[in-house]
Amino acid sequence: MAIVKVKPTSPGRRAMVKVVNKNLHQGKPFAALLDSQSSTAGRNNNGRITTRHKGGGHKQHYRIVDFRRTKDGIPAKVERLEYDPNRSANIALVLYADGERRYIIAPKGLTVGQQLMSGSEAPIRAGNTLPIRNIPVGTTIHCIEMLPGKGAQMARSAGTSAMLLAREGVYAQVRLRSGEIRRVHIECRATVGEVGNEEHSLRQIGKAGANRWRGIRPTVRGVAMNPVDHPHGGGEGKTAAGRDPVSPWGTPAKGYRTRSNKRTTTMIVQRRHKR
């Protein structure tokens, strides 16, 4: 993997920085693990915008990634590493001994030909998936389940990981990359190691068009709008917002907590804001 500063042949390429990985598969993805997905452009079933700044972008196939890793005791061989347009991490196509192929999130250091295993008897090695009760305290993990059997939901982005801090009864304590310490049931599964493609955060888009390829539309400042469109809008000429920063619906935009899921609050040992 290499960081490449693009030759400045145009203003759009002058600031562009790419992450190049020559180990990624250059051909087509595995067709049996592809699914079609239509672009919603941020609209719901009523056609109304529910997520702003979305629309356009290149057409993509969804790669069906195995987040459960439930084929216990069956060794798998890494056939190739692939780019996935739907996520920041790369994915790996693995071939199980029974002939089935699946995509998984590619951990850091994974190589073609490497053997992987899942289940409680799997060795503690990067890429292997085990129940948390079988993982030693202090191990770096990723792709962590929040409910047993539901599939990995935490620490799935490029370069992310978590640390297994302790086990108390039927729960374990995991410190996430944000600094939050969270309780997770010991029957939940996690994968050893950290997610690969850690240099993803070093890339520079370089030009607005590159974001349009990704389906990201421009973000207009509130002070540039009319009063009917935003609380910061209006005024004669260029004027300040006149109040603390808020969203278009009046919610404070800087540091205001909006989490409302009280049902799982007991699972958070330490908030990420209280480091």
From Swiss-Prot:
Q: Keywords in UniProt for this one? A: Ribonucleoprotein, Ribosomal protein, RNA-binding, rRNA-binding
- Which SMART domains would you find in this protein's record? Ribosomal_L2, Ribosomal_L2_C
* Region entry Disordered, spans: 35-59, 224-275
Coiled-coil annotated residue ranges, if any: none
A Pfam family annotated for this UniProt entry:
Ribosomal_L2_C
Name the residue ranges with Polar residues bias: 35-49
The protein's matches in SUPFAM superfamilies, at most eight in alphabetical order, are given as: Nucleic acid-binding proteins (SSF50249), Translation proteins SH3-like domain (SSF50104)
Q: Name one GO cellular component term.
A: large ribosomal subunit
> One GO molecular-function annotation for this sequence?
structural constituent of ribosome
Q: Name one GO biological process term.
A: cytoplasmic translation
- Provide ranges: composition bias, Basic residues: 50-59
The answer on whether this UniProt entry bears the keyword Transport reads no
Similarity comment: Belongs to the universal ribosomal protein uL2 family.
User: Its function?
Assistant: One of the primary rRNA binding proteins. Required for association of the 30S and 50S subunits to form the 70S ribosome, for tRNA binding and peptide bond formation. It has been suggested to have peptidyltransferase activity; this is somewhat controversial. Makes several contacts with the 16S rRNA in the 70S ribosome.
Q: Partners and quaternary state?
A: Part of the 50S ribosomal subunit. Forms a bridge to the 30S subunit in the 70S ribosome.
Name of the protein this chain belongs to: Large ribosomal subunit protein uL2
Organism expressing this protein natively = Burkholderia cenocepacia (strain HI2424)
**What is the gene name?**
rplB
